[in-house]
Design a protein with these regions (language model features):
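Long, intrinsically disordered, low-complexity segments
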Residues: 20, 98-101, 177-179, 258, ...
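Conserved, well-structured interaction surfaces
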Residues: 41-46, 50-55, 78-146, 162-176, ...
């Protein structure tokens, strides 16, 4: 909301966010002294709002944090997935700046107590909960990345060599500390009206983070063979059910608007607080913009992010049946494969139904709204974060607010935790998966059997409930910075190397109609299947450099005559954790041993 955005702008404008010289002796997040600053609730609020500005995930993280995953095709891959492309010498995220957020939080938690004579106990506990919320999030991110990490719950004295050069604490110890912080925040952060739907940390936000982290840790432990999985999954259920049972949140779902219910959550400037629990807010009036529309529309600025066919196939039919149960489903033409499908599909990718503003006027004209290969790679062009206006596709001018936590995720967390515990039933289904599907026009009936398509994709997982939870999560939270984490916790890192197939090509060398308007739009051809005759007006011609089996570096065609983008990637199981950077090990040998599989 504007009041919070105004306060953030004021804090930034006054340069209250200090630059830091050293991780261990830096100034706190604000240029102030504790003797005079922490003497009122206003001081606590100001400091807490500063955390929102400095710690909240950025627009880039929220909208494209999942671009290097199995369900997004990019022009290039990251070094981490290249053969020989990543090592301890190249590793990062252990420098002073990476630990600075922890110092700032611990400084705040230590010195905020100076406000106790001026602030009532409930308010003090609320703001302590805010600090512990951010510390929990910080450490969860560090554990996801490195596994064992040193735990610090106070700012470090620069003369304390024992603390400066301590070793890494075990994952279990650190995560128990994280859970303590989460429990405190979820208990003592306030749910008073002045904190709710004002985009600040409150009890519901704390419960949302607890739900997310506990699901991650519970399933990580289950699939990576560690003890304690059930404890974490039950903590996820407890947090999710508290939020589901005692909060003002629900799904954005209006009867008769199934084709737009989903997209409303992502395309509006004012956060959709019916569903959104916390957002990174943007606002045109305050000149607060991001670049998501530009990134996804530009072939040079972005990575030409696109959806792979294997993912598009996961979307159900509106009658609740599986698209992939139909014989030849993988050979369905683009113009036909969206009819009668989950309406989230057309709200996530450009389809023949897509309408956007071009030159200030809304149009569905195919040549104007559908991009060529210069801006995407598979012809499943992502529009989830786009404002559907070409005025925002060549600059940083998007002002749609971006959800950080939303109620839909809580339903998904509850469903998956219950499924992993073996406790999914019709009651749980009807409270979680069913409403998510029904708001986008899909009949929400429970599955009678496990989906063989998903069982094959997820390498033999046969539990029908777990498979449906994974389907729903991948669709509902697509490109919301959750997929990479999901693959890591499910021990499915090898899916990062899946084939990146695109649309089905009816016949090489022959133009075809993409959108069903009776006009040919596109023609793929190759050396062995050349285009026939002269080029047709209005048809884009794309050369496929070879067919399946040939040594190619760009595009191929697979056995189902689907376009395939060639992108070499490599996975090894030691990559479930990143290496501790070599320079950090050299400075502090007590951080050894290095994570398994990585050389120093």
């Amino acid at each position: 909301m504007k009041p919070i955005l105004n306060k953030i702008a004021i804090i930034a404008g006054l340069s209250l966010l200090a630059s830091c010289q050293s991780f261990f002796d830096e100034d706190p997040v604000y240029s102030t002294t504790t003797d005079t600053f922490f003497n009122s609730e206003t001081a606590l609020e100001t400091y807490a709002i500063g955390f929102l500005e400095s710690h909240l995930p950025s627009a880039a993280t929220l909208t494209r944090g999942d671009q290097y995953s199995d369900i997004c095709v990019t022009t290039q891959t990251e070094g981490f997935l290249k053969t020989g492309g990543y090592s301890a010498q190249q590793a990062n995220n252990w420098a002073r700046g990476n630990w600075r957020p922890l110092y700032n939080v611990n400084y705040y938690l230590k010195h905020m107590k100076d406000a106790a004579p001026y602030v009532d106990d409930a308010t003090m506990k609320h703001y302590e909960g805010v600090g512990r919320f951010w510390r929990a999030w910080f450490y969860w991110d560090k554990v996801k990345t490195f596994g064992d990490v040193p735990w610090y719950d106070e700012p470090i004295d620069p003369d304390d060599d024992e603390q400066l050069y301590k070793g890494r604490d075990p994952r279990d110890y650190v995560m128990q500390k994280v859970l303590e912080d989460l429990d405190f925040a979820a208990t003592w952060c306030s749910k008073a009206s002045k904190y709710v739907n004002t985009n600040v940390i409150n009890r519901y936000v704390a419960l949302a983070l607890k739900s997310r982290i506990c699901l991650y840790e519970g399933t990580w432990r289950k699939y990576h063979g560690l003890d304690g999985s059930e404890e974490w999954l039950r903590a996820c259920v407890a947090a999710s059910e508290e939020l589901m049972g005692d909060s003002p949140y629900s799904l954005v779902s209006t009867a008769g608007e199934e084709t737009t219910n989903y997209s409303k959550v992502f395309k509006s400037e004012e956060p959709q607080y019916t569903e959104v629990i916390l957002a990174n807010e943007f606002n045109a009036t305050l000149n607060r913009f991001h670049d998501a529309s530009w990134y996804y529309a530009s072939g040079s600025y972005g990575q030409r992010n696109s959806g792979p066919k294997a993912f598009v196939n996961m979307y159900l039919n509106l009658d609740g049946t599986r698209f992939t149960d139909k014989d030849g489903s993988n050979k369905t033409q683009f113009k036909d494969e969206f009819a009668g499908r989950d309406y989230r599909l057309r709200q996530t990718f450009i389809t023949p139904y897509y309408v956007k503003k071009v030159g200030g006027k809304e149009t569905n004209e195919f040549a104007k709204v559908f991009p060529g290969l210069t801006t995407q790679l598979t012809y499943y062009r992502i529009i989830k974060w786009n404002t559907d206006d070409d005025a925002n596709e060549s600059n940083t001018s998007s002002a749609n607010s971006l959800p950080v936590f939303r109620y839909a995720e809580i339903l998904l967390n509850e469903a998956e935790a219950k499924a992993e515990l073996g406790e999914m039933d019709q009651t749980v289904w009807n409270k979680t998966i069913r409403p998510l599907r029904e708001r986008s026009g899909v009949i929400g009936a429970m599955p009678a059997t496990a989906d063989p398509y998903l069982a094959s994709y997820y390498d033999g997982v046969t539990d029908k409930w777990i498979l449906e939870c994974r389907r729903e999560r991948s669709i509902e939270l697509y490109m919301e910075n959750t997929r990479r984490d999901d693959l890591m916790r499910w021990r499915m890192g090898h899916k990062l190397t899946v084939e990146f197939a695109g649309i089905h090509i009816p016949e090489l060398g022959k133009p075809f109609d993409m959108n069903g308007d009776g006009k040919n739009d596109l023609c793929f051809y190759s050396k062995s299947h050349p285009k026939s005759g002269s080029n047709q007006t209005g048809v884009s011609y794309v050369e496929v450099t070879a067919e399946e089996g040939d040594n190619v570096t760009t595009y191929s065609v697979n056995k189902d005559n689907c376009l395939v983008y060639i992108l070499d990637r490599e996975w090894a199981d030691y990559k479930y954790l990143y290496p501790v950077p070599k320079n950090a090990l050299d400075i502090n040998p007590n951080l050894r041993p290095q994570n398994p599989g990585w050389d120093d």
